[in-house]
Amino acid sequence: MLCLFFAKKGTLKLETEVLHEAPDTFSRTIVKGVLDGNAVANYEGLVTIKKGAKNADADLNERAILLSPHARAGAIPRLEVLENEVKAGHGATVGKVGEDELFYLATRGFPKNEAKRLIVRGFLEAFIEEFPVKEAKEIRTALSKI
């Protein structure tokens, strides 16, 4: 499951749930977000691996980047594992565009807004490649407006 969000204002609440009920199942949940202005995003993800779902393989990850000192993001990734023989992982990170990164790009002639756009593009590009062509094109168009 791939989830992507952009926001400049308002509050976004995103919830995902993945359920493994059978043996030898596989899931990857990847959530990425870019927040600017005074936007707030809260993500809650749950992966449940039921008893009997031996050899299930599950991963749940959320990553958000903040472009404004007023933007906020929170994430609660959760695993509920009721079977012993599984592979399961989860994680979440929220970070901001660093002044060092902006300075580095400024010394190479990039204005601040273009530098932010490049950093966000780098943060998302490999992820965008996972989307179907039409959606990837729409995402890149939206990125050009950041």
Task: Pin down the residues of each PLM region.
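Extended amphipathic alpha-helical segments enriched in small hydrophobics
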Residues: 104-109, 114-125
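Short arginine-rich
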Residues: 123-133
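Conserved beta-strand/loop scaffold segments within soluble protein domains that form the structured core
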Residues: 1-103, 107-110, 132-146
